[in-house]
A protein has these predicted regions:
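Hydrophobic alpha-helical
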Residues: 1-31
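Sec-exported extracytoplasmic/periplasmic mature domains
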Residues: 4-12, 33, 37, 54-61
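Thr-Gly-centered strand-to-loop micro-motif
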Residues: 15, 43, 83
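Structural detector of well-ordered beta-strand residues that form the stable sheet scaffold
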Residues: 18-20, 38, 88
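Hinge/beta->alpha junction and helix N-cap segments in small-molecule ligand-binding domains
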Residues: 20-27, 43-51
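Short beta-strand elements at the ligand-binding edges of bilobed clamshell
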Residues: 34-46
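Hinge/cleft segment of the Venus flytrap/periplasmic-binding protein
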Residues: 51-97
Length: 97
């Protein structure tokens, strides 16, 4: 949202370029509704937490780290589990309120 504010302070229309954010905060979601933010991404904390707990249990049990998480591991580092970001746009912002 800092980019939106900076553009407004300079008299520029933030709607003239696509500005994106991260975390799908309440302010970010409102900016999408207002048309000043093109999109944000929701980081699924619940999914991250579940995957972390499952990964810890898997390590203790000698199982593959991502087994049972429903997520994939990184191609280059088997200890990174990718919990996908969820894009939030004007089309689905209401789903995140």
């Amino acid at each position: 949202l800092g980019a939106v504010e900076a553009m407004q302070q300079q008299g520029l229309d933030p709607k003239s370029v696509p500005i994106v954010g991260i975390d799908a905060t309440a302010d970010g979601r409102q900016a999408i509704k207002d048309g000043t933010l093109a999109m944000t991404v929701f980081q699924n904390a619940e999914g991250q937490g579940r995957a972390s707990l499952q990964a810890a249990a898997n390590l203790i049990d000698g199982k593959p780290i991502a087994e049972g998480t429903g997520y994939e591991v990184d191609d280059e580092n088997e200890f990174i589990i990718w919990v996908p970001f969820e894009p939030v746009t004007i089309d689905n912002v209401a789903d995140y309120d």
